[in-house]
From Swiss-Prot:
HAMAP family documented for this protein: HflD_protein
Topology of this chain in the membrane: Peripheral membrane protein
Name by which UniProt lists this protein: High frequency lysogenization protein HflD homolog
The keyword Membrane belongs to this UniProt entry's keyword annotation: yes
SUPFAM superfamilies for the chain: YcfC-like
GO CC, any one term: cytoplasm
Primary location class: cytoplasm
Family the entry assigns: Belongs to the HflD family.
Localization in the cell: Cytoplasm; Cell inner membrane
Upper lineage: Bacteria, Pseudomonadati, Pseudomonadota, Gammaproteobacteria, Pseudomonadales
Organism expressing this protein natively: Pseudomonas entomophila (strain L48)
Keywords associated with the record: Cell inner membrane, Cell membrane, Cytoplasm, Membrane
Amino acid sequence: MNNLQEQLIALGGVFQAAVLVDRIARTGQASEANIGCMLGSLLVRDPKDTLEVFGGDDLNLRDGYRALVGALERDPSSLQREPLRYALSMLGLERQLNKRGDMLDIIGNRLPQIQSQADHFGLVHENVIASSGALYQDTLSTLRQRIQVHGDMRFLQQASNASKIRALLLAGIRAARLWRQLGGHRWQLVFSRRKLLKELYGMMRTTD
């Protein structure tokens, strides 16, 4: 696996989180498997490669890849506007987080507690989701830049959905951090679109 593929997997994780946030906001539903994959990505330590962060299978990121392709192709018929907005916001928030060592320490200290809960209850248990959402609320949601989630108020006002959305945003920002650590830059999305798309098309063939 080359470095660009590693970057695209991490970026696919950002977009996967964005797609799931949009899905919950609009319909109140997202599969437990998809949510579990993203929550699990918060807890992976010392992965052998980037794909292992997301369960070791490209299929787990299929929806994220599709949204990323739609953004890079700039085709109005395939562009998922809200997921793109959420993804770009997560990339921006990660840059702010990187300047906040105190906030990184809080996140680093509380993730082992969430790991213990996940070991006891399972990844998608309401306690694990609530703790992950609370960690986002106590840290990233206090930054100047905020992510405004749009959708159906019937679903957004449900506490369980709000926790899922916050937990997914935390996971997406973790993926954004990984992307940047692998050498990813926002200008690539503008100036290296063709190169990224060529690599993505090949990666997506294994998920269809």
